[in-house]
C-alpha cells in the first residue's frame, strides 16, 4: 500500500555529537573527503545504502549507535577537529578578503554579488540540475566559497528534482520523477523573528498571487536560496509552478521564470534583512531564464527611490552581468508576445503593470523585442538589462557576438560588446582522491589552485602516474559492471543470463568515455556511423578499445531517445557487449568515476554548437586525454600534445556527408594515433609516450580548467567593474544615473539626424608607402549634440574585392572647429598601418564617461 504523505524525521543527536548537524547540512562536506570519511565511519554499510547522504544517514542510523559514538574518544576527536576546520573555513580570510586588504584596487570589489540560475548541481543529494548549466552553476558557488567571494545564489526548489532515467527492454528511455522532501535534504527554511516562514509574493494578474517560501542550502560560505511554490497559501495550479525542472508548457515555464527573477530579487531582500546582511551590489544572470530580475530591480528604484524608468534602467544596467550559454537562437527562451503581455500589461486601466507596479507595461515588453514581432526574447532582455555580457569560451564569445549582432546594427560582429570567460570546474569535487593525495605529497597541499602542485609534476616517476591512471580505470570498470547488472535486471533480465558481466570490460584496455546530454548537435551516434569499423576497434586482438556511453534525453525529445536506443541496441549485441555499454541515469556520482577512469574523453559536436563542454575539462583534470572536435574550450586550449583534434568538415553543407567525413576521421585517429600510443610499453609495462601526454595535460590544462580561475576572472573583469559602475550611478542621490539617462535620451533622439556630410583625405604621396601620413577631415552634423558628446573615428583596414574593411584599425579624430551651417569639423593625421589594398571610412559614436564602451548603446553613423 502507498503512503498518503511522505515526510522525513531526523534523529535526535546526543549533545556531544551536535556538531554532526552543522557538518551534515553545510554542503561543504560534498567536496571535503575527511568529512565524508567521518560520516562513513558512523555506519559504513548504511552510508553506502544512503547514497553518501549525511542527512539521510543521520535519519536512519540506530540511536544506540549514536550513543556509542558519543563515548568514542577517537570519533569525538575527529568530529571536533572537523567541526573546528569547518568553522575556520567559514570565517578565515580567503583570496577575496586578501584582495580587499591589498589596497586601492580592492575598493572596486563588490560587497556582495547575487547569482541567479534555474538549476544548480552542487551535490548528488540535491538533484536540482539537468546538465552542464546546472553543474557549472554548482561549481561556480563552490569555487566562490573557496575563494571567499561574497555570493548569494538564487534558484527554484523543484519538488521532483530531475528525472531518473532507466531503459525498457528494447532500449527506450523511461523517466521517473523522485519526490523530494525538503525536510530530508540539507536545507533550512528561512523564517522571520517570530519563527514564521518568510514568503515572497508575485502578482500574476486576474487577482492571482504566486507565493513561495525560501529554502536555504548552505554551500560552504555561499547561501543558495531556493524558492518553493508548493505551499497551502497558493491555489492548486500555482502550487505546481516549481514541480519540475524544465517541465510543462510555456505557460508553466514563464511562471517559473517570473518567480525566479522577480521572486528571486524579493527573496534576496528578505534574506539579507533577516540575516542583517548588506544587499548585493552586482547581479549576475546565468542565462536569460532569470531576466525578470532586472525589471524587478527597476521597479524597486521607481517605487522606492522615486526614479523615472530610464534612470532606474541605467542603475540596473550598470550593476548587471549577463552570461549566455547557448550558441544557437533555438537555445534561447522565446515566449509568445501576447503571453508576456498578459502578465505585464495594463491590469488597472492606467497603463501600469500589475506584475511590476509602477512600471509602464510597454517599456517592459520592449526590452524583449526581437526581429519576430510576435516573440519576446529572454536573451535580448538580458542583454538590454546588462552593461556587461559574456560567452563561456573564446570561441563561444565570437559565436555570441555574431548571433546577437542585430542588437548592435551597424557594428561588425567583432565589435559587439560581449566578451568571454571560459568555464572551469571545481577541482575538489571532480579530481580523484589519488590526485589530491599526490598534491599533498608534492606541495603539502591538496589545493590544486596552488601552481606549485602542477609545476612539480615533472618530479613524478612515469610509473607512478601510470599506476594512478590504472587504479582509476580499475575502479571505473568495477562500477560499470555493477551498473550494467542493475540496468539489465531493470530491463527484465535474470541473474542466470548475466554471468558475462563478471568479465565485461577490462581494467587493462584503453577506455573511452562519452557522456553528456543528448541534443542532436552533440551527435551521440556519430560513433555508430560505420558499425563495421567500430566493431574492428572494439574487438582488435592487439589494441582493443572499450567504450562507455551515458546521457539523458529531454523527456519530450523523442529524437534524442531514438539516438539512445540506437546505441543501446548496438551495445546489447552479444559479440561486443563486453566492450561497449550505455549506462542509464547519468548523474554526478556516475560522472565522477567516468572522469576519473576514462583514458580518453570523446566529444564530437557539430562545430561551433558546443558553447564550452566542461566534461572534457573534468577528464583532463584527472589525466584523461581529450579526443574532440575543435569546439568550445578545446578550440582555445588544444596544443597538439594534450590530446587529439578530430578534423571538422565545417564547410560541407550536406549533413550526412559531414558526419561521414568526421566519423571516418574519428575512427582513423583511434586506430592510428590513440590506440598505438596507449599500447606501446617499455620494459616496465609503462606506455611512456602516453604518460608524457598525461603529464603534459595535467601541467598545462590543470591550472586553466579550474573554476577558481573562472570565478577570479568574473571578479576581476566583470564583478569589480560592475560594482564601480553601480557606485557611480547610485551615488549622490543617483545624479550620475540621471545624467547618463538624460544623455542616452538626447543621443537616441538626435542619432537618426546625425550626418557625416563630407570626408576629405590629404597628405598621401602619389604612391603611398607603409607609414605614409594620411590626414582625414570629416564634416559632421550633430543634430543638437555637442562635440564632446560623440566620438568621431577614422577606420582603416585592408579591403576585400567588395571594398569591405578587414581587420580594421580605429583612430580617434579631434574636434578642430565649427564650419558653415553649424557643421562640426573633426580631423586626424595617422601613419598608414597596413600594406596592400587599403581603405578607410569615418563613423560617429556616442561618448560619455559612464558608458562601459562607445558601442554600448548600439548607436553608430557611418560615412
Curated annotation (Swiss-Prot):
**Matching InterPro entries, A to Z?**
Agluc_phsphrylas (IPR011834), Glyco_trans_35 (IPR000811), Glycogen/Maltodextrin_Phosph (IPR052182), Glycogen_phosphorylase_DUF3417 (IPR024517), Pyridoxal_P_attach_site (IPR035090)
Question: Does the record bear Phosphoprotein in its keywords?
Answer: no
Enzyme Commission number(s) of this protein? 2.4.1.1
GO molecular function list: glycogen phosphorylase activity; pyridoxal phosphate binding
Obligatory cofactor(s) = pyridoxal 5'-phosphate
State any GO BP term from the record.
glycogen metabolic process
Answer yes or no on keyword Zinc-finger. no
Provide the positions where the record notes the PTM N6-(pyridoxal phosphate)lysine: 618
> Pfam families given for it?
DUF3417, Phosphorylase
Catalyses: [(1->4)-alpha-D-glucosyl](n) + phosphate = [(1->4)-alpha-D-glucosyl](n-1) + alpha-D-glucose 1-phosphate
Q: What keywords were assigned to this record?
A: Allosteric enzyme, Carbohydrate metabolism, Glycogen metabolism, Glycosyltransferase, Pyridoxal phosphate, Transferase
From what superkingdom does this record's organism come?
Bacteria
Database matches in PANTHER family: GLYCOGEN PHOSPHORYLASE
Family membership, please give it: Belongs to the glycogen phosphorylase family.
Q: What biological function has been recorded for the protein in this entry?
A: Phosphorylase is an important allosteric enzyme in carbohydrate metabolism. Enzymes from different sources differ in their regulatory mechanisms and in their natural substrates. However, all known phosphorylases share catalytic and structural properties.
The protein in question is named: Glycogen phosphorylase
User: What broad taxonomic lineage does this protein's source fall under?
Assistant: Bacteria, Bacillati, Actinomycetota, Actinomycetes, Mycobacteriales
**Quick one: which gene encodes this?**
glgP
